[in-house]
């Protein structure tokens, strides 16, 4: 009994911390429409079209971000058939994926970690090590894993599923055929979506399994792991090949194949080496050293997490923790694979290193497991909790501070539009937030000033701009129920209004003024929206 009470004391603070992070993520998901940026709204729109057309591949689209099979937008499509609200559906789907990640983390590492260690890792997994300045919209973690259109959540889930199976094979524990089939099917569907799983899971997993089998060919467990890794690689490759044969109905005027990762470009090896390394350091949090003194603690925390990840690997090797060290080696190899691909093959974005968000929670849990002595463990617990509290302040406080102001700002715009009978808005990439706050009562179609109209008076003044909307919304325009909205942001030279003012010719301005009449202007500290009415339905090239 005393031992159980002692164990509870060890992990109770982590339980409370995990619950705080969890409640915060859920609150953001269901109150975050005013943070919906272009990509988030695009994914919510994808879910809506999937539900309406009962297909993962909606027809006649201008541009959908990628194929979605088991990603959050695909899950949101199921919720849309119930709620008929794309933003609410995406909130439900993102929250479900968040909970599944936490549950899958627990299930995956339960065979090698005690409950206190698992809870310390779960606390970090819930967000304590995702360093950023906005829990709702940070593309360095929260938005792509947990909040509002969490696209990368599916990759992390499938990775955890495979690691859990690998650990059970290594520990000689039974693994059901249904679980194996689920993992292989998931690998196939992610292959259809993109090449990310091939890079972060399939290749490093196969290489480690192959090396371990070559070292000990007589071990049946190593042989099973190799067969599983090879099957995963094969299924993912089959998905990639299937991607090439699926007829794409999106009809994009801008991208012929939106499901592939961008190539590395034509820079030198040295340049690409620097860019790939910078992307990794950006994700880790060391990027904050370049900002003011307010952000220096977050940069220091990023350095500490980097040291923590390396220390955990050394300690596991020293303690001869076979499975713990193998999984950590896999995570490091996965990160190195992304880095190498960035140097040799693709153009790396920071979020491609998302395995970091698994490496640090796992490192935390393994350190907690292997530290000897109550004093060391107590100090480690306090340090981890303080780091989590500091990160919570940096991530949550900025959103909480401006929540009410932003909510009121966008509510006023939506009310004005509805009072004037507007059902469709055409605008640049900073305006979908307005449609998100309307709860699907107002439809958004993305447009941008047409540079070609500078010299061609017959060309339309606007062009579609990467929006996941059926192309009929650009053909069958109803001016009496439509408005053009252009944004002006002091932080963005490519905001629609600023681009119009600074980059287009006098003849274009004359045509624009003759076609559009400004009706309203809404201004906040971050952005100003100019609303125009028009009567000519042929405004789009």
Residues of each region from the PLM?
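Luminal/periplasmic acceptor-recognition loop/helix of membrane-associated glycosyltransferases
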Residues: 441-531
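Short periplasmic/luminal acceptor-recognition loop of GT-C membrane glycosyltransferases, typified by
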Residues: 419-455
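Transmembrane-helix motifs of polytopic, lipid-linked glycan transferases
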Residues: 10, 17-22, 92-120, 161, ...
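Hydrophobic/aromatic-rich transmembrane helices and adjacent perimembrane loops
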Residues: 150-158, 199-200, 296-304, 325-373
């Amino acid at each position: 009994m005393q031992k159980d009470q002692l164990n509870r004391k060890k992990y109770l603070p982590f339980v409370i911390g995990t619950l705080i992070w969890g409640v915060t993520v859920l609150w953001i998901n269901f109150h975050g429409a005013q943070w919906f940026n272009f990509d988030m709204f695009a994914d919510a729109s994808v879910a809506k079209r999937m539900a309406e057309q009962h297909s993962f591949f909606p027809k006649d689209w201008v541009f959908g971000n990628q194929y979605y099979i088991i990603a959050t937008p695909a899950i949101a499509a199921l919720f849309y058939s119930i709620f008929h609200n794309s933003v609410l559906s995406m909130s439900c789907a993102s929250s479900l994926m968040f909970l599944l990640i936490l549950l899958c983390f627990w299930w995956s590492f339960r065979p090698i970690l005690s409950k206190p260690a698992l809870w310390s890792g779960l606390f970090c997994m819930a967000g304590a090590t995702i360093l950023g300045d906005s829990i709702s919209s940070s593309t360095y973690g929260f938005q792509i894993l947990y909040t509002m259109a969490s696209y990368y959540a599916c990759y992390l889930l499938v990775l955890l599923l495979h690691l859990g199976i690998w650990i059970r094979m290594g520990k000689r524990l039974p693994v059901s055929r249904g679980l194996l089939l689920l993992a292989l099917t998931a690998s196939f569907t992610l292959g259809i979506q993109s090449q990310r799983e091939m890079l972060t899971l399939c290749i490093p997993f196969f290489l480690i399994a192959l090396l371990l089998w070559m070292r000990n060919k007589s071990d049946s467990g190593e042989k099973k792991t190799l067969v599983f890794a090879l099957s995963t690689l094969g299924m993912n490759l089959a998905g990639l090949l299937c991607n090439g044969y699926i007829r794409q109905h999106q009809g994009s005027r801008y991208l012929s194949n939106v499901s592939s990762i961008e190539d590395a470009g034509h820079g030198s090896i040295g340049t690409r080496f620097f860019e790939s390394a910078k992307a990794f350091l950006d994700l880790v949090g060391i990027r904050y050293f370049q900002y003011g003194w307010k952000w220096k603690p977050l940069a220091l925390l990023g350095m500490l997490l980097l040291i923590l990840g390396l220390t955990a690997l050394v300690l596991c090797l020293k303690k001869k923790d076979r499975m713990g060290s193998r999984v950590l080696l896999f995570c490091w190899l996965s990160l190195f694979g992304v880095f190498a691909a960035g140097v040799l093959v693709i153009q790396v974005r920071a979020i491609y290193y998302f395995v970091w968000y698994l490496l640090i929670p796992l490192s935390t849990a393994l350190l907690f497991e292997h530290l000897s002595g109550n004093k060391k463990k107590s100090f480690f617990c306090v340090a981890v909790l303080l780091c989590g509290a500091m990160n919570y302040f940096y991530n949550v406080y900025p959103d909480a501070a401006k929540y009410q102001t932003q909510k009121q700002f966008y509510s006023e715009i939506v009310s004005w539009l509805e009072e004037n009978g507007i059902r469709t808005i055409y605008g640049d990439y900073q305006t979908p937030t307005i449609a998100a706050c309307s709860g699907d009562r107002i439809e958004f179609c993305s447009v941008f000033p047409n540079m070609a109209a500078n010299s061609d008076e017959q060309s339309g003044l606007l062009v579609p701009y990467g929006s996941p909307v059926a192309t009929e919304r650009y053909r069958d325009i109803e001016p009496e129920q439509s408005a053009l909205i252009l944004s002006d942001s002091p932080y963005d030279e490519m905001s629609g209004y600023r681009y119009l003012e600074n980059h287009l010719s006098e003849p274009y301005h004359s045509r624009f003024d003759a076609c559009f009449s400004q009706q309203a202007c809404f201004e906040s500290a971050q952005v100003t929206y100019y609303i125009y009415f028009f009567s000519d339905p042929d405004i789009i090239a």
